[in-house]
Structure formats: structure tokens, C-alpha cells
């Protein structure tokens, strides 16, 4: 056996103890120990974890940062014993959003807008936004571009469950389609000729409305779309995403919003606006008013007119689409950007300050209040808790800033039941409690307390930050288990055990064929956009997680270069 392989096997055995358990309420103990170390009150109940008030902005950065962590750390925990029927709460919000869209459709259908000054202002913004959208995307739909960008997602459809959600299975199995979308499938089939076999399972009128876990207070409602509808929806979404780049809005990159939020917290010239249930509040009439007729017809043809609830009830949608639709994210980004830019134009404010990522909106502070008036007029509800127009705090796209300082909290989202869960939490404490690897001594005491609960060898095994949470993040140069081979470092990490699930070779071929077509012909697709593609599309099996963990090895991509050619390559020895 080669020396490297022998050493890897030896280390794998040393780190083999991964089945350990923790107390049920250890998440609360970790949080309260942190608060005690920083001298702030502990959390006494599950209700307090999710209902802690936003901290005062009239204090220093360090104090705010800790109090903000207290308000957020367990706010998204999914195991609080609150006795709330989270599914019922989700459906209540879903039906409320539908009622809101119905009222918006009626309001926007009125002919006389001039009776009220706000409505007159709203009408001006809508007409300006319509003109901007027309100029951006054109009057006619570029069906050729849409066809080149159509693809299946990796999720469930009305005919295929999540387990078989990979595109290769969807190409191999007949998929559902709605009656109005069927003509696009026929046209696509004629364009492909005999190269692909596009089969239909059922022609239907509805999608499936379901809930997925969100937090301890409520679930989240989404829709599972017919497979072929999703195929074309994603093509439309990709084209809209391309067009938005002409406004310097890149939906593949959150860093622009994050950077602008930092600048806004420092200079107070930009506001961050967040909307509640944004994707469930895009009414049909609003889309009809804003989009060119041909685009509107396409969007309505590809949507599902109805949704089937788990209890069998059928709901006729008042909104254009919901979470789960393939073009929802791009469409809402387009609408919010157009409205925001229109408000700026009418107020004679620089439109370049507008940046949008979904329902995360950044705009000049002077335009924030008029923009929120328009949003309320067209049926959206600003989330006042996450909207910041004045003061030293801003938040956007997962980054939180106070006077230009990163105060982003970390979250404990689920119970800590295994070694992998504890490593994730300890790494979160490390990232929150260090600056360039230098510890805040208050956070270090808590980190070291819970570090002792890990097996000894896992305490010593460290990997560089940026390589996931399969091991503790830290000073990797002292890791006794690292293996240096061909000027690269190999690190042992925890990975979830996976099993192979066979898939159709025919479906794999079609997936590879259409995927390569997209990467070859799209003029907008950059190298960074290709990272989400399956690297082995023709493999005859896929990996499925099992909930168990084992030791695997990752390779450090950093090339170890000798400092001088004369001295040669430095020798790196492993600790015994």
C-alpha cells in the first residue's frame, strides 16, 4: 500500500468516532453562556428567543453587535416548543396574501386614479415603470433566447418527487404540463426534431400548493409546478436575468447589495427596503399594467391558474406566480427595480443608486418614503422590521452593518444532535468572535467550553476557513492530520454518507445535451454562472444523503510554492 494511502487510512481510523450525542437544550446553553460572557441578560424562554426587540441604535458598535446577536441567534430555530400549528399559520398567511392580491387587482382595474393624490402619484410611477420595462426587455419576446435557456430544475414537480428531482430523471420520465403551456412544448418539440423525446404525462390546470419548514412560528408556502411549465419558466427567468444586467443588476451576485448596505450604514445616504411575502403579492393586474402585452401573455400562459391545497381544495390564483415558479425571482426583481428607478426619475434623483436582489431593495434615502407609498398602492407590504431608512444600521442580502462595521449575527437553526451540528455551531462562534483569526477573549471562553465536548482528535483537526464546516475552522498549519502531496494539502473532514441512486442513461444524455447547448450559445453566461452545473452529467447514478456521517478528504486548492528556487521545496512533516 502506498505511504500516502496508508497514512490516510490510519487518520481515518483515528477520527472514526463520530457518533456522539448532546443534551436537548444545549443550543440554549450556548446562547446564554455567550450572553453571560458579554454581560447582557440571558434568554429565559422560547417565546423570548423569537420575540426579542430590536436593540437600540443609540449605543456603541460593540454593545449593539452583542445585543443584536441576542435578538437573532435563536429567532430562526425550528425546534422551539411553542405549541403553534406552523402549517395552519402558513396557510393563513397564504390565503391572506391571495385576498390582498384580489383587492389589488380590483383597485388597479379602476379607471379614475386622479381622485386621490397618492393614487395619482402611483399611476405616474406605474406608467414610467412600464416605459422603462418596455425599453429594457423589448416589445417582443425573444423566443429563440428563451428556448436556448430552458431547463429543468433539481426540485420536485407535480409528477416527480424530490428524490428523483434531478434533471436527468425529468428528461427520462413524462412530465405534466398545463393546457395553455402545451403549445410551447409542441413548438419546442418541432424545433428539436427527432433528437429528443419530449413526453407528456398529464395536461392539467393546477400546481400543488405545499408547505416547507421555516421556523417555530410558521411554515413557508410554496408551489410545486408541472414539469414542462417549470422547464419554460426557467428559460423566461434566465432571459429576464440577462436583461437586468443592463441596469447593472446582477442576480448572480449579492455582493453589490451588501457593499451598498455597508455604505448606507456609514453615510446614511442609502435606504434598505424589505417587503413581506413579496413573491405572493405580485398581482395579475400589476403585471398586466407593467409588462408589454406579448410578455404578459407568455407569463400567464406558463403559470398555473389554480393550486390544489393538501386538503383537496382548489384555489384560483389572484397572483401571477409564487415561490416555486421558475421566473418569480427574476420577475419580482424586474418589477421592484422598475418601480424604484421610476420613483427616482420622477423625483429627479440619480437612478444609479437603485440596486435590487429579489425583495432586497436599496435606494436613495430621499426616495424611500415615496417608494414605500407606491409599493403599498400596488399591493406590497414593506417589512418595517427589516426596512432601514435612517440611522447607522443597514441590512441586505444576509449582511448586517452598523456604522460601516459588520455586525452580522449567526443563527442556530436546528437542534444540536450530532458531531457535525456542534462543529457547525463552533465554527459560527469562531467566525463571529474573531477578526483575522484573533479572538475576542469573551467569545473564546465559551468556544473552549463547548470544544471540550468534541472527541480529542476532532479538537485538533483544523481546516482553513472557506472549505465548509466538515471540521473546525482555525489555524490549519498546526493540524497533525494534514497530508501534503504534490504541493497540495489534504484535510480530513466530516461528510454525510451518501448512497447511489440509479438513473436513466437516456435522461442523462438529454440533460447533458441541453445543458451544453445553454453554455455554448448564451452570450451572457460567464464562467462564474457555470459553477452550479453538474460536473458529471453522464454518470449513471446520483448520490443521495442518508443522515449518517463518515470521514472523507478535501484538497486545499492553494499551491504550496517554495520561497526560493535555490532552497528547493520545504519539507513538511506530519505529527506522529
Swiss-Prot record:
Look at the named UniProt entry and state the broad enzyme category this protein falls under: transferase
Q: Which cofactor does it need?
A: Mg(2+)
- Binding-site list for Mg(2+) 1: 274, 359-360
* Quaternary structure and interacting proteins, as annotated: Homodimer; the replicase complex can dimerize. Part of the viral RNA-dependent RNA polymerase complex, the other subunits are the host ribosomal protein S1, EF-Tu and EF-Ts. S1 is needed for the initiation of genomic RNA (+)-strand replication.
Q: Which domain of life is it from?
A: Viruses
**What's the source species' lineage?**
Viruses, Riboviria, Orthornavirae, Lenarviricota, Leviviricetes
Alphabetic keyword roster: Magnesium, Metal-binding, Nucleotide-binding, Nucleotidyltransferase, RNA-binding, RNA-directed RNA polymerase, Transferase, Viral RNA replication
Q: What does this protein do?
A: This is the catalytic subunit of the viral RNA-dependent RNA polymerase complex. This complex is involved in viral RNA replication that produces (+)-stranded genomes via a complementary, (-)-stranded intermediate. Binds RNA cooperatively with the host ribosomal protein S1.
Name the species this protein comes from.
Answer: Enterobacteria phage SP
Per the UniProt entry, what is one GO biological process? viral RNA genome replication
**InterPro entries in alphabetical order:** DNA/RNA_pol_sf, RNA-dir_Rpol_cat_phage, RNArep_beta
Task: Respond yes or no to whether keyword Nucleotide-binding is given for this record.
Answer: yes
Indicate whether Oxidoreductase appears among the record's keywords: no
Q: Please identify the protein, giving its name as recorded.
A: RNA-directed RNA polymerase subunit beta
The record lists Mg(2+) 2 as bound by 274, 359-360
| Span of domain RdRp catalytic | 259-391
Task: Give the E.C. number(s).
Answer: 2.7.7.48
One Gene Ontology term of the molecular function aspect: RNA-directed RNA polymerase activity
Q: Name one Pfam family in it.
A: RNA_replicase_B
Amino acid at each position: 500500500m502506498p505511504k500516502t494511502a496508508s497514512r490516510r487510512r490510519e487518520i481515518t481510523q483515528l477520527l472514526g468516532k463520530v457518533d456522539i450525542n448532546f443534551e436537548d437544550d444545549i443550543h440554549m446553553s450556548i446562547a446564554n453562556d455567550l450572553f453571560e460572557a458579554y454581560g447582557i441578560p440571558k434568554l429565559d424562554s422560547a417565546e423570548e428567543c423569537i420575540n426579542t426587540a430590536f436593540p437600540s441604535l443609540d449605543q456603541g458598535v460593540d454593545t449593539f453587535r452583542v445585543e443584536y446577536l441576542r435578538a437573532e441567534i435563536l429567532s430562526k430555530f425550528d425546534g422551539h416548543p411553542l405549541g403553534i400549528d406552523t402549517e395552519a399559520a402558513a396557510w393563513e398567511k397564504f390565503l391572506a396574501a391571495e385576498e390582498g392580491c384580489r383587492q389589488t387587482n380590483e383597485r388597479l382595474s379602476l379607471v379614475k386614479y386622479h381622485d386621490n393624490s397618492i393614487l395619482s402619484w402611483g399611476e405616474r410611477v406605474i406608467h414610467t415603470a412600464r416605459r422603462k420595462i418596455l425599453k429594457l426587455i423589448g416589445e417582443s419576446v425573444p423566443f429563440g433566447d428563451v428556448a436556448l435557456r430552458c431547463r429543468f430544475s433539481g426540485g420536485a414537480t407535480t409528477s416527480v418527487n424530490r428524490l428523483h428531482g434531478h434533471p436527468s430523471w425529468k428528461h427520462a420520465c413524462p412530465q405534466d404540463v398545463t393546457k395553455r403551456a402545451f403549445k410551447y412544448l409542441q413548438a419546442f418539440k418541432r424545433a428539436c426534431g427527432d433528437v429528443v423525446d419530449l413526453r407528456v404525462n398529464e395536461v392539467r390546470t393546477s400546481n400543488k400548493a405545499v408547505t416547507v419548514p421555516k421556523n417555530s412560528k410558521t411554515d413557508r408556502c410554496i408551489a410545486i409546478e408541472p414539469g414542462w411549465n417549470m422547464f419554460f419558466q426557467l428559460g423566461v427567468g434566465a432571459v429576464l436575468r440577462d436583461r437586468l444586467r443592463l441596469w447593472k443588476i446582477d442576480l448572480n451576485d449579492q455582493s453589490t447589495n451588501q457593499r451598498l448596505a455597508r455604505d448606507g450604514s456609514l453615510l446614511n445616504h442609502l435606504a434598505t427596503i424589505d417587503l413581506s411575502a413579496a413573491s405572493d403579492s405580485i398581482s395579475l393586474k400589476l403585471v398586466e399594467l407593467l409588462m408589454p402585452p406579448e410578455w404578459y401573455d407568455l407569463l400567464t400562459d406558463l403559470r398555473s391558474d389554480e393550486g390544489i391545497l393538501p386538503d383537496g381544495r382548489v384555489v384560483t390564483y389572484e397572483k401571477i406566480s409564487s415561490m416555486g415558479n421558475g421566473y418569480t425571482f427574476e420577475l419580482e426583481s424586474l418589477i421592484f427595480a422598475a418601480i424604484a428607478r421610476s420613483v427616482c426619475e420622477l423625483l429627479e434623483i440619480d437612478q444609479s443608486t437603485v440596486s435590487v436582489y429579489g425583495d432586497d431593495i436599496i435606494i436613495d434615502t430621499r426616495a424611500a418614503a415615496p417608494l414605500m407609498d407606491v409599493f403599498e398602492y400596488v399591493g406590497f407590504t414593506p417589512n418595517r422590521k427589516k426596512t432601514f431608512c435612517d440611522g447607522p444600521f443597514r441590512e441586505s442580502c444576509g449582511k448586517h452593518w452598523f456604522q460601516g462595521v459588520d455586525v452580522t449575527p449567526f443563527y442556530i437553526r436546528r437542534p444540536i444532535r450530532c458531531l457535525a451540528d456542534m462543529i457547525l455551531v463552533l465554527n459560527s462562534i469562531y467566525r463571529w468572535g474573531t477578526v483575522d483569526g484573533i479572538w475576542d477573549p469573551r467569545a473564546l471562553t465559551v468556544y473552549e467550553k463547548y470544544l471540550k465536548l468534541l472527541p480529542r482528535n476532532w479538537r485538533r483537526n483544523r481546516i482553513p476557513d472557506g472549505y465548509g464546516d466538515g471540521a473546525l475552522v482555525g489555524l490549519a498549519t498546526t493540524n497533525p492530520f494534514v497530508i501534503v502531496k504534490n504541493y497540495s494539502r489534504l484535510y480530513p473532514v466530516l461528510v454525510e454518507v451518501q448512497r447511489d441512486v440509479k438513473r436513466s442513461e437516456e435522461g442523462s444524455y438529454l440533460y447533458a445535451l441541453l445543458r451544453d447547448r445553454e453554455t455554448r450559445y448564451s452570450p451572457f453566461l460567464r464562467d462564474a454562472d457555470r459553477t452550479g452545473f453538474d460536473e458529471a452529467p453522464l454518470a449513471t447514478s446520483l448520490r443521495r444523503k442518508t443522515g449518517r456521517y463518515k470521514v472523507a478528504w478535501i484538497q486545499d486548492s492553494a499551491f504550496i510554492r517554495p520561497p526560493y528556487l535555490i532552497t528547493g521545496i520545504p519539507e513538511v512533516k506530519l505529527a506522529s
